[in-house]
Amino acid sequence: MQFIDQAEIEVQGGKGGDGMVSFRREKYVPAGGPSGGNGGRGGSVIFEADANLQTLLDFRYARIFKAEDGKKGGSSNCTGANGKDVVVQVPCGTMVYDLDGECLLGDLVSPGQRLCVAAGGKGGLGNQHFLSNRNRAPEYALPGLEGEQRQLRLELKLLAEVGIIGLPNAGKSTLIAALSAARPKIADYPFTTLVPNLGVVRKPTGDGTVFADIPGLIEGAAAGIGLGHEFLRHIERTRLLLHVLDVTAGDPIANFRVIQQELDAYGRGITEKPQIIALNKIDALDGEMIGEIETELKRFSTAPCLHISAATRRGLDDLMQLVWQWLDEMAAADAEAQRLLELELQAQAAMNNPFNSDVPIDGVTYSS
């Protein structure tokens, strides 16, 4: 399947139904008065995050989404039927921008999360609403309002906890294939990987963690050279970076610094992410040469270095043990931060509550 991570589309909510002009006509009621109903609401265009989608490819073929118009109001004060909403499935991790205002409308990250991107117009009022002492038989009603219309830009940022980065042909695809059931294209030439590959790696407990194999970065990637500029955004959501460094390719230290400089140039907090360096293809060098490379790396980075061979699976158990340890520590820190935030919010609510003088929260009493 072709990987598409950007798209521009048009969305339009349905027009509200027109109000009705009618009068009550019944036997023995010669002047029944106005009885025109309101028009129905126009349908809305709604985005819904779908965990089964991984690309915006569908938007290459369908670029305009319009919801159904509301129905006209009826007689006997009957309101017209509402127009049907159009629900559009998008991948989790889709960011929705309004092209006119260049503002972010929403970020759909959780399966089932919804975002209304074009609201339907309100239905027009029927003539029943215009009855007054001066006008006992109004012969006019309001038309329905037009629905919202927007030009949108969709941008997909993959949801992965671990991002695998490195120069082309460093062995990133071989690594994700060795760790997961993913089967990316693997060959002995640069830029074999042209799109991000996702793989679910299982912990010893059976829980799955998503790894993203990012296409090879080169010098100038942050400025748009090569493939890196297109895919650096997918690193933004990762929690941990796994830098695969080919110890047999030219100058490994210079190669490492190239990637670090590109991450720093791209910005957006990427260089602040925890990083593990995986020295790959160690079976091609002797231990002394690998030790020299590791010693030199420590001059430029405090990240831990692990020795692996993705092709033979050598050292992968130790690598994954460190990855799981770091991810578990991050999850514990996040849980503790969330707990403290909830306590703070509870304390503020208790102090602002005039009916509670002393409210115990998690064993602590806060006096208002």
Curated annotation (Swiss-Prot):
Its EC number is 3.6.5.-. Keywords: Cytoplasm, GTP-binding, Hydrolase, Magnesium, Metal-binding, Nucleotide-binding. It is found in: Cytoplasm. Pfam families: GTP1_OBG, MMR_HSR1. One of its GO terms (cellular component) is cytoplasm. GO terms for molecular function: GTP binding; GTPase activity; magnesium ion binding. It comes from the Bacteria. Mg(2+) binds at S173, T193. Residues 1-159 form the Obg domain. InterPro entries: G_OBG (IPR031167), GTP-bd (IPR006073), GTP-bd_Obg/CgtA (IPR014100), GTP1-OBG_CS (IPR006074), GTP1_OBG_dom (IPR006169), GTP1_OBG_dom_sf (IPR036726), OBG_GTPase (IPR045086), P-loop_NTPase (IPR027417). GTP binds at residues 166-173, 191-195, 213-216, 280-283, 309-311. GO terms for biological process: ribosome biogenesis. Residues 160-328 form the OBG-type G domain. The keyword Transport does not apply. Its main location: cytoplasm. The keyword DNA-binding does not apply. Its cofactor is Mg(2+). It is an enzyme of class 3 (hydrolase). HAMAP family: GTPase_Obg. Belongs to the TRAFAC class OBG-HflX-like GTPase superfamily. OBG GTPase family. An essential GTPase which binds GTP, GDP and possibly (p)ppGpp with moderate affinity, with high nucleotide exchange rates and a fairly low GTP hydrolysis rate. Plays a role in control of the cell cycle, stress response, ribosome biogenesis and in those bacteria that undergo differentiation, in morphogenesis control. Monomer. PANTHER family: DEVELOPMENTALLY REGULATED GTP-BINDING PROTEIN-RELATED (PTHR11702), MITOCHONDRIAL RIBOSOME-ASSOCIATED GTPASE 2 (PTHR11702:SF31). This is GTPase Obg. It comes from Synechocystis sp. (strain ATCC 27184 / PCC 6803 / Kazusa).
